[in-house]
């Protein structure tokens, strides 16, 4: 099943997404269609000495060597050994990774507004979830795939996010930034790196809806928000309101249209960049390049 030719009919800024639903044990999970390159039958895996316990090994696919991560192992579930098991070939954070899952069933279209933030769940699963979708009698978990990769690589001594601060610059200290990011891990990394570089005046929000309401409150007493906000940095995938919808609303409003908006997301690829352009994003940078983000922010606010 190839999703490279699958036509994503959603327009940018509609605050909707399409997810591929799959099973791991008794639970149903989902992944954004935009992250999925194709879904294949499991193939022979070459084990790698001293690899992480959740990494099954490597496979060769169309001339590329790709790592295989078992979501059975990651979520503490025994593999089913079923002929229905699948490999989901994904692309995000400028890399390709294969996830070993159970059966893959169908694609669902849902609104980000309907996706709830995870609360405390059994076995601490909420640490690796970005949201929960309730569909009639079914609950679908949305894993935080970036955090899964980060945790595995951190255990192996790998610096996923290439943390190399550009150094402190006094000119950055009076600039007001807004960060919109639902991942606590990414929010912390972004804040730490930006503050170390001199960007101390930061307002942060975990979804686009909260950020938009905050910005519109500022707009009540201001005709040009660019005097109060120097730049907005937003993720795309977030419950309640995604980054594309947030960007579209801000650019359509005369009071906020001049505020630079940078999309910082694992979904920034050559194939998907146009979706940010359509809604008016001033800049788009792919995770995990935080150092590149700081350089680009500088070009908008201090240079």
Curated annotation (Swiss-Prot):
Residues 176-302 form the Response regulatory domain. It comes from the Bacteria. Phosphorylated by CheA. InterPro entries: Chemotax_regulator_CheV (IPR024181), CheW-like_dom_sf (IPR036061), CheW-lke_dom (IPR002545), CheY-like_superfamily (IPR011006), Sig_transdc_resp-reg_receiver (IPR001789). One of its GO terms (biological process) is chemotaxis. Residues 16-154 form the CheW-like domain. The modification 4-aspartylphosphate is found at residue 235. Pfam families: CheW, Response_reg. SUPFAM superfamilies: CheW-like, CheY-like. Keywords: Chemotaxis, Phosphoprotein. The keyword Phosphoprotein applies. SMART domains: CheW (SM00260), REC (SM00448). Disruption phenotype: Cells lacking CheV are somewhat reduced in chemotactic proficiency, but a double mutant lacking both CheV and CheW has a strong tumble bias, does not respond to addition of attractant, shows essentially no accumulation in capillary assays, and has greatly reduced methyl turnover on the methyl-accepting chemotaxis proteins (MCPs). The keyword Iron-sulfur does not apply. Involved in the transmission of sensory signals from the chemoreceptors to the flagellar motors. Chemotaxis involves both a phosphorylation-dependent excitation and a methylation-dependent adaptation. CheV and CheW are involved in the coupling of the methyl-accepting chemoreceptors to the central two-component kinase CheA; they are both necessary for efficient chemotaxis. Moreover, CheA-dependent phosphorylation of CheV is required for adaptation to attractants during B.subtilis chemotaxis. Consists of two domains: an N-terminal CheW-like coupling domain and a C-terminal two-component receiver domain. PANTHER family: CHEMOTAXIS PROTEIN CHEV. This is Chemotaxis protein CheV. The lineage of its organism: Bacteria, Bacillati, Bacillota, Bacilli, Bacillales.
